[in-house]
Structures are given as C-alpha cells and as structure tokens.
Amino acid sequence: MDDNKKKALAAALGQIERQFGKGAVMRMGDHDRQAIPAISTGSLGLDIALGIGGLPKGRIVEIYGPESSGKTTLTLSVIAQAQKMGATCAFVDAEHALDPEYAGKLGVNVDDLLVSQPDTGEQALEITDMLVRSNAIDVIVVDSVAALVPKAEIEGEMGDMHVGLQARLMSQALRKITGNIKNANCLVIFINQIRMKIGVMFGSPETTTGGNALKFYASVRLDIRRTGAVKEGDEVVGSETRVKVVKNKVAPPFRQAEFQILYGKGIYLNGEMIDLGVLHGFVEKSGAWYAYNGSKIGQGKANSAKFLADNPDIVATLEKQIRDKLLTPAPDVKAAANREPVEEVEEADTDI
C-alpha cells in the first residue's frame, strides 16, 4: 500500500474509532483466532456431525421436524448438558406444554431452570431479548415459533385474516436480538414445526412456520425425524431418530447422526457410544460379545450399555477417544502467537 493510501486509511480508522468507539474496525490478524465455544447436545454422534462438539454459543439455532420427532427432548438434553457445566438456562414455553417431571427425568435441574409462559408472540420475543441482554443467561429455548401468536391475532376474531403477521414479527425480532445474542455469547434455540405448501409439483412441499427470516439468521438448522421404533419384545420403549444438519455456518453442513431416544429417559448415549466405538475401532465386536481394551464388557448391545452405565470412568475415556479422533482440533494458539506481526498503520492527525 502506498503512503497516500496509508494516510487516508489511518485517517478513516481514526475518525471511526472516535465516533463509534475502540474496536469498531479492527484487523483480523491482530487477534488470535478463537475456537467457537460449544454446548453438547447429549448425543455424541450429533456433536460430531455438528463439527465443533455441540451447538455454538453466541448463535441462533433452529430445530424443526414433524410432531413427536424429539424436538423438545433434544433441547431439554442440551439444557441438561449446559447445566452440568454450570450454565444458567431459560425455557420460553409459548406452547404451554412443558412437563417438569419429564424434564427432570432427562437430567434437567428444574429448580434452577427459568421458565416463561408468555401470552403473545411479542411478549415471548421481548422476554427473550431482555434475558439475552442481561448477559447472565447461557442457553435460551423458545418452544415453538408456531406458537408465537401475534397480539393482533389473539385480540381479533377467530376467522380474521392476518397475512404475514407472524413472519413480520419474527423478522423484526431477529433483526433486533441477533447482535445482542453475539455480544452476550448466548445460545438461543428456536423449535419450529413443519407445514405443507399447497400446489408444489416438484421438490419437497415441506416448509417451516414463521417466514424465511429464521432460516437466514440461524447459524445451525437441524432437521429431526423419527425413523423407527425401539422395542423390547412387543413393547415399544423408544424411537429411532435421525438428525440432519441442513445448515451450518461453523462447520461443513449436510452431515447426519442417528441415535435412539428412550421414552422417559432421553437420548440413549451409552448405546450410541457402543455403536461409535465399534465403528471406529475402539470397541471390539466378536459375534454377540463386545470388548474394550481386550476385556469383555457384555454380551449384546444392551448388556454392554449397562456395563458402561455402571462404569462412568470408562465412558469418559471412550468418549474422549472418539471425540479426539473425529472432531477437528481447536486452532493452535501458540502458532498464532508466533506468526509474523501485521504491519501497523500509523494514525494520522488529520480529520476527513
């Protein structure tokens, strides 16, 4: 860069800093690259599919799928994992359907969980924004976008037409809270429902509620589906679940994970650990027997999973081995610190 351009740039940067504050514009090379902090989903396979070990903090996440596919269960699992790390969590229950007893069975500390059951969509989103701006909340779940009913619709008659009202509400709210979410380093999860578009001849007729704004503002979008039933004899005790990462701004998208959700218990993590351990060579399988580090741990997947449940130390070791192999390592801070410094531009005294 020639001297005249350097002086012009320095003058512009100086004026910007005086007008908007220090840090309004900065060189990316002046700061070490930070790994994006993540909160585990409670599913090891899904954490790996997300690329960073969980859902990213400081971002918006959308989880959508058909009814009874496990959307709320997955978000409660995220809350349980966050609370284990000492995080403060909130649940904005726009559907008025949160079951504290079920949440407790999934590992959620319901005594410490903040819950709001707002009357209108405006109230729900305003409460969410105020919680974010407090800088004291780590995870907020909004259940669901479809239940964020605009005030005008509630006060109107049952047959009144309110075209695009909810979409405008979501668009305005997301414009307002996105920057606050980043500054507060808070994870905000929106649960959404599926609707069918009429008259679609080609492609999928499925769409989500609340317009297109959430699709743009979300850093991660998860499509969760129930693919089958988990049975013990003739009794159905859970569901086979597939989650596809349809959008990901923090890692490569379109990966997917499959796991089981057991009724009244949540995500079947130990069974998932057995499957991933066998797949990646950490657990040996011979016939119906499973072995770890040369020692047999059980006959059949169910017995092996029970062994893991009784031995949390082995679970922690196996999980670390799988994560170390499959997850991208964090940026090398030492290497970043040792790189050549970026040429600094001297600030000029003149104003533009």
UniProtKB/Swiss-Prot annotation:
ATP binds at G65, P66, E67, S68, S69, G70, K71, T72. Keywords: ATP-binding, Cytoplasm, DNA damage, DNA recombination, DNA repair, DNA-binding, Nucleotide-binding, SOS response. It is found in: Cytoplasm. InterPro entries: AAA+_ATPase (IPR003593), DNA_recomb/repair_RecA (IPR013765), DNA_recomb/repair_RecA_CS (IPR020584), P-loop_NTPase (IPR027417), RecA-like_C (IPR049261), RecA-like_N (IPR049428), RecA_ATP-bd (IPR020588), RecA_C_sf (IPR023400). GO terms for cellular component: cytosol. Pfam families: RecA, RecA_C. It comes from the Bacteria. Residues 343-352 have a biased composition (Acidic residues). One of its GO terms (biological process) is SOS response. NCBIfam families: tigrfam_recA. Belongs to the RecA family. This is Protein RecA. It comes from Pseudomonas fluorescens. The gene is recA.
